[in-house]
């Protein structure tokens, strides 16, 4: 909750009391990357898959791409409703939540980690509901199932990596007789970047960097 000062002239030496302002709903969610929850996050950031292909045996190939249009007026991507129970009587419900940032990171001795930054419109206190948890698979993606290729060729030089997606989304306040944000919209294009640590064993990638050579970066994780 924002606070703002009251500025006026009065016969006192102290400043007047401040007042409560805009109620902002923002935060990050971090979790080990399981296939099904990860799918919700990908949809939340990129929208519905551009293509879905059945691979048989309950396996599917989903292709997500940077969106070319907003989900709706005042909602750049599909909104979600989140319920958070902190073991204190009731649950906190956050409505109109959109996923702004998305991060995947991996390194040895660590599962694939996912972090999502969210922006919401409103919050309320509701009765606790009973969630249904994913029953299979019971383990997240592990580092020892990860393989990486650059420009179509497998490489063992990558020691750690982080994939970042920034939707550049923010809540927009207005004079609408409420402390909630009026709408949520983009302030710029969706940005995708990759960072990490690479074994500097030769000058191949250094030369590609100097020449600004564009290459395909493919990350593969498998899960039974």
Model-derived features: where do they sit?
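Signature of extracytoplasmic/envelope-associated structural regions
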Residues: 1-224
């Amino acid at each position: 909750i924002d606070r703002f000062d009251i500025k006026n002239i009065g016969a006192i030496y102290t400043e007047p009391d401040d007042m409560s302002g805009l109620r902002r709903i923002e935060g990050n969610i971090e979790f080990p990357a399981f296939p099904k929850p990860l799918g919700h996050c990908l949809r939340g950031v990129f929208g519905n898959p551009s293509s879905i292909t059945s691979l048989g045996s309950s396996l599917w190939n989903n292709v997500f791409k940077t969106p070319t249009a907003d989900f709706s007026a005042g909602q750049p991507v599909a909104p979600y409703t989140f319920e958070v129970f902190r073991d204190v009587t009731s649950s906190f419900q956050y409505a109109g939540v959109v996923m702004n940032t998305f991060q995947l990171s991996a390194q040895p001795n660590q599962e694939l980690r996912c972090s999502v930054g969210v922006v919401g419109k409103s919050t309320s206190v509701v009765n606790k509901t009973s969630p249904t948890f994913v029953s299979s698979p019971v383990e997240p993606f592990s580092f020892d199932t990860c393989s990486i290729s650059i420009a179509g060729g497998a490489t063992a030089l990558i020691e750690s990596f982080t994939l970042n997606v920034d939707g550049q989304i923010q809540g927009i306040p207005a004079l609408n007789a409420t402390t909630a944000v009026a709408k949520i919209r983009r302030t710029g294009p969706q940005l995708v970047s990759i960072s990490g640590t690479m074994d500097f064993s030769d000058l191949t990638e250094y030369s590609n960097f100097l020449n600004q050579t564009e290459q395909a970066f493919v990350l593969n994780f498998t899960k039974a």
